[in-house]
Structure formats: structure tokens, C-alpha cells
A protein has these predicted regions:
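Catalytic metal-binding/acid-base residues of hydrolase active sites
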Residues: 36, 58, 89-91, 141, ...
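Flexible, glycine-rich phosphate/dinucleotide-binding loops
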Residues: 13, 41, 60, 92, ...
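Generic recognition of short, well-ordered alpha-helical segments
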Residues: 16-19, 46, 65, 88, ...
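Cysteine-nucleophile active-site neighborhood
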Residues: 54-120
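Short glycine/serine/threonine-enriched helix-capping/active-site loop
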Residues: 35, 86, 177-179
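Pocket-forming structural segment of enzyme catalytic cores
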Residues: 97-170, 174-187
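N-terminal beta1-alpha1 cap of cysteine-dependent amidohydrolase-like domains
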Residues: 1-78, 193-204
Length: 204
């Protein structure tokens, strides 16, 4: 049976994201494991076919051991397995690959339109997205484009209406979004996770 690890960054706080993400995995007939990373629980290496790193209330510059460990683990997982990161998880993924992560002038909490880039329109996860697709954001930090084109081939897939990065692909296996695709909204945002899981679990 294919397997999905959900790396939960909510620190035990009530949320609807983990249940929604688990439902996506189960819909794809995957064995789902949920790991409280803030509490120090992590997936066993090479045990899972793909990973989703959730959002959460923490800060991407937190000096706590869990933040350091998650940020270091993401590129290790992505060396061989697909990883999708959301919200805070996306900020940690971006930082792990050397992209600037900054606190914006105002927090973003609500539904906002995004703008896909040409790379986004051709990316297998984002190709359903249109200009002004509504997405849910709940954040006080943002990811900025790197000052120079990354040699790794990393690309911005979409920009938020605030002008920072809404989604990016850092490597073949490492991709994520500042918005929450697990939130059910009108538009194509929820297809991002469905496409990620179909691609990650196909043939496993």
C-alpha cells in the first residue's frame, strides 16, 4: 500500500488541516501517518512514499529544536521522495533552499487571488490554476524570490496579490505553497494536492 507522512506543525493546537490532508491521502488509498514534529515525533527515514509538511502557528525563525530539525529534514526527504509544504512548512522549505523569508508589513489572513507564472502554468501540480484563483492565506511571514536566478533550476510557480511568492518548485521533489490548498474554495486550488498525491503515489 502506498504511504503518506503528514508532518504536523500545529504543536497540538486544534486545526482542520490534518484531517483534510488525511482525507486526501485516504482518497488515494494511501496509508497515512501523522507526526507531531513540534512535539519531537518524525517519520522514520525511507519509510514513506511522500511527505506533506503542514502549516502552523510557529515562526520560521524560531530557534526551537523542532524548527531546526524540520528545516534540515525537508531537503533530505526530497532527495528521493516527493515533498509538498504548506504555509509555515513552505517557509521552512524555502529557507532550507536559501530563499529569503521575511515578515511582511501586514499579516495576511483570508482569501486572496494569486497569479500563476508561465512556469506555474506548465507545472504538473499547478496547471489547473488561473489568474485570480482564490486561495486561503493565514500568515505573518512571506517568501521572496531569490535575488539571482537559482542555479538549481528552482522556479516561482505563482505570486500572491501582495507580490511575494505564493508557490514554488525548488527541486524535482520539493514543492510547496504559502496558501492552504487543503481549504475547499471555489476555483482550482484544491487540485494542487490531488495532483501531488496522484503523481507521488502512482506506481507505488
Amino acid at each position: 500500500m502506498p504511504s503518506l507522512a503528514i508532518v504536523d506543525l500545529h504543536g497540538g493546537r486544534p486545526n482542520t488541516a490534518v484531517a483534510a490532508l488525511s482525507a486526501y491521502g485516504e482518497a488515494n488509498r494511501a496509508e497515512v501517518g501523522v507526526f507531531d514534529a513540534v512535539g519531537g515525533t518524525f517519520p522514520r527515514p525511507r519509510r514513506f512514499d511522500c511527505y506533506i509538511v503542514t502549516g502552523g502557528p510557529g515562526m520560521p525563525d524560531d530557534s526551537a529544536p523542532w524548527r531546526v530539525r524540520v528545516q534540515a529534514a525537508i531537503p533530505e526527504w526530497a532527495k528521493s521522495k516527493p515533498v509538498f509544504a504548506i504555509g509555515l512548512g513552505f517557509q521552512l522549505m524555502a529557507a532550507a533552499y536559501g530563499w529569503p523569508v521575511r515578515a511582511p508589513q501586514v499579516s495576511r489572513d483570508g482569501v486572496f487571488p494569486l497569479t500563476p507564472t508561465p512556469a506555474g502554468w506548465t507545472d504538473p501540480l499547478m496547471k489547473d490554476m488561473e489568474n485570480a484563483t482564490p486561495v486561503l492565506e493565514a500568515r505573518t511571514w512571506g517568501v521572496l524570490s531569490p535575488p539571482a536566478a537559482p542555479r538549481s533550476g528552482a522556479v516561482v510557480l505563482a505570486y500572491s496579490s501582495a507580490g511575494d511568492v505564493a508557490a514554488a518548485r525548488f527541486t524535482k521533489h520539493a514543492v510547496g505553497s504559502i496558501f492552504h490548498p487543503e481549504a475547499r474554495l471555489e476555483g482550482a486550488a484544491s487540485t494542487v494536492l490531488a495532483r501531488f498525491l496522484m503523481g507521488a503515489l502512482e506506481g507505488t
